[in-house]
């Protein structure tokens, strides 16, 4: 894991995205564990963290020393004395170490800034290492960051006690092997019961490694496998546990129809399934049964090129309680498939039809007529959608988020239909080439709009953005 330079200047802060954040390393003064499985960590060794930069507040003539920052006595100010000083030095009130104040203050900093602030002093670290400041964040650890190289060239596993103190319940491991995963399990004290979510990306985990991981880490209920090409469908059959409620598999070349059979039979409590596999066919979707029908509420079939309307039939009959469905990139699905969805999945709140080139305005008529609870609709790259389709959507009072990125046939007349959608909070028109400045300016009538995306829109001029800033002051306009 990366850490600030020895000169004290931190690297540029990294921003959380989708719950994932790259955390800098923590010089917490603790020894590192041996690479040998099961070997206890070395005894704690005192380690002095690098001194933080001392920046004087505007109201102070001289910068505070580290002692003062930690609540100790302030040194006298330099310069000519104004008079004789009698008695002991006045002690600064320990505001900088008041835990009540710090507990409120630290909420205003990003995750990466908190990592740096935790190095200021023990009092700050004690406050910052409370799990509440790290809830919802997932540390990302690359394989090379899991080991320290000793002077003799040997490697030892890094100390993960700082992560345990902050109570992280999920990890994303990138480029790891079976051995790396075993070392992680042996050296992270919360791995057996405390870790709820594991994500493995671009890793060489095998069937055996997957089985050991899920057998040892009994707390894992959310699993993501992305770009892992060394495990097979047999590995899923031998390792999947009924406790898993969320599973995501993408870019894993050995995943095909039999993987869905394993998922449907072994995961009766599955609530969320995300699958991106080029070789999955309609046959796989027939494996879903009533067992998943009661529990599964989210299904994402991403770029499953072989799935047709026949596969959609299997989905709508087996999973009637879906509230979120994505058919993004399922290029063989047509308007008839969307009609099946609209007629049978009346509980849907989110529907993603992006990158479905066969979808036309007729599909939007089905959506508008039957999906009265729908709050989010994604139509990115649906190149056959026209202004007529938008006229159907304008009747949907429940819709709050509408994505029309790169819908190249949408024109100003279609935007006029959207002006009737008073509950709309998010609208994306990125890449729509036929929209003019005049047509876009009418969007100021949507006073409840919170986010408007206009990237790569020829009609989005600097004058238009200025106009929006004046008439849509509460809306984030993405240029």
Curated annotation (Swiss-Prot):
Q: Give start and end residues of every LRR repeat.
A: 321-342, 347-369, 373-394, 398-419, 423-444, 446-470
Q: Where in this protein does the record put region Disordered? A: 1-92
- Which InterPro entries does UniProt cross-reference here? F-box-like_dom_sf (IPR036047), F-box_LRR-repeat (IPR050648), Leu-rich_rpt (IPR001611), Leu-rich_rpt_Cys-con_subtyp (IPR006553), LRR_dom_sf (IPR032675)
Identify residues that carry Omega-N-methylarginine.
Answer: 92
Q: Which UniProt keywords apply?
A: Leucine-rich repeat, Methylation, Repeat, Ubl conjugation pathway
Q: Where is the composition biased (Pro residues)?
A: 47-60
Q: What do the Gene Ontology cellular component annotations say?
A: cytoplasm
The keyword Lyase is assigned to this record: no
Domain F-box per the UniProt entry, residue ranges: 94-139
Q: What function does this protein fulfil?
A: Substrate-recognition component of the SCF (SKP1-CUL1-F-box protein)-type E3 ubiquitin ligase complex.
Its quaternary organisation is: Interacts with SKP1 and CUL1.
What is the recorded name of this protein?
Answer: F-box/LRR-repeat protein 16
Lineage at the top is: Eukaryota, Metazoa, Chordata, Craniata, Vertebrata
What's the name of its gene?
Fbxl16
């Amino acid at each position: 894991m990366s850490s600030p330079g020895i000169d004290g200047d931190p690297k540029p802060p990294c921003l959380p995205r989708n719950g994932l954040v790259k955390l800098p390393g923590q010089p917490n003064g603790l020894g590192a564990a041996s690479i040998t499985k099961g070997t206890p960590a070395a005894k704690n060794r005192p380690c002095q963290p690098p001194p933080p930069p001392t920046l004087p507040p505007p109201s102070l003539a001289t910068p505070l020393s580290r002692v003062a920052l930690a609540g100790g006595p302030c040194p006298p100010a330099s310069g000519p004395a104004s008079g004789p000083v009698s008695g002991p030095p006045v002690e600064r009130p320990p505001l900088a170490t008041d835990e009540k104040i710090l507990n409120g203050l630290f909420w205003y900093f990003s995750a990466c800034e908190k990592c740096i602030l935790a190095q200021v002093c023990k009092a700050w670290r004690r406050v910052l290492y409370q799990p509440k400041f790290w809830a919802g964040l997932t540390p990302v650890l690359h394989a090379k960051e899991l080991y320290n190289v000793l002077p003799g060239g040997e490697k030892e596993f890094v100390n993960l006690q700082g992560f345990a103190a902050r109570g992280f319940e999920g990890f994303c491991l990138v480029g790891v092997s079976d051995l790396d995963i075993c070392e992680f399990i042996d050296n992270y004290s919360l791995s057996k019961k405390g870790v709820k979510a594991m994500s493995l990306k671009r890793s060489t985990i095998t069937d055996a490694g997957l089985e050991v991981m899920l057998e040892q880490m009994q707390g894992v209920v959310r699993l993501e496998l992305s770009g892992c090409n060394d495990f097979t469908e047999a590995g899923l059959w031998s390792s999947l546990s009924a406790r898993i409620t969320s599973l995501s598999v993408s870019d894993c070349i050995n995943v095909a129809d039999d993987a869905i059979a394993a998922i449907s039979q072994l995961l009766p409590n599955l609530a969320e399934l995300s699958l991106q596999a080029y070789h999955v066919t309609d046959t796989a979707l027939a494996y879903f049964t009533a067992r998943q029908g009661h529990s599964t509420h989210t299904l994402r079939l991403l770029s499953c090129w072989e799935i047709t309307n026949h596969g959609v039939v299997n989905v709508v009959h087996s999973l009637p309680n879906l509230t979120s469905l994505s058919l993004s990139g399922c290029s063989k699905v047509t308007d008839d498939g969307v009609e099946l969805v609209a007629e049978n999945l009346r509980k849907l709140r989110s529907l993603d039809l992006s990158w479905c080139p066969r979808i036309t305005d007729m599909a939007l008529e089905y959506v508008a007529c039957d999906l009265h609870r729908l709050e989010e609709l994604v139509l990115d790259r649906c190149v056959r959608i026209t202004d007529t389709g938008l006229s159907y959507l304008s009747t949907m009072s429940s819709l709050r988020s509408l994505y029309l990125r790169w819908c190249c046939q949408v024109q100003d007349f279609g935007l006029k239909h959207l002006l009737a959608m008073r509950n709309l909070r998010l609208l994306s028109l990125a890449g729509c080439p036929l929209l003019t400045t005049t047509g876009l300016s009418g969007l100021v009538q949507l006073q409840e709009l919170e986010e408007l995306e206009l990237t790569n829109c020829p009609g989005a001029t600097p004058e238009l953005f200025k106009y929006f800033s004046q008439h849509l002051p509460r809306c984030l306009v993405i240029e």
